[in-house]
């Protein structure tokens, strides 16, 4: 599956690369796992509700969540920083 990043999620990814390399390693592990198993696996995957009902969330750590959407052809990453409730 193709990986796609929103403008916000790419900025988040670059921020982790510069300021939180240990968490970036965790993010990369989550991305690999999502490619293998989009709806199960590490990071406690959970479907989101309400206006984000087509998205899923995985725990990076207690503060940050990886939010993504799976389509027939790609995985779209919406954000990596904070909880999805901050959108």
Label for each model-derived stretch:
Residues 32-59:
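A short, surface-exposed loop/turn module that caps and links secondary-structure elements
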Residues 24-32:
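PIN-domain endoribonuclease scaffold, especially VapC-family toxins
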Residues 2, 11-24, 49, 57-65, ...:
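Enriched for short, Lys/Arg-rich terminal
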């Amino acid at each position: 599956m193709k990986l796609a990043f929103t403008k916000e999620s790419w900025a988040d990814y670059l921020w982790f690369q510069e300021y939180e390399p240990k968490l970036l390693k965790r993010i990369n592990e989550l991305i690999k796992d999502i490619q293998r198993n989009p709806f199960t696996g590490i990071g406690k995957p959970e479907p989101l509700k309400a206006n984000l009902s087509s998205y899923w969330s995985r725990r990076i750590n207690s503060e940050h969540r990886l939010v993504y959407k799976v389509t027939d052809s790609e995985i779209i990453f919406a954000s990596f920083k904070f909880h999805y409730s901050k959108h």
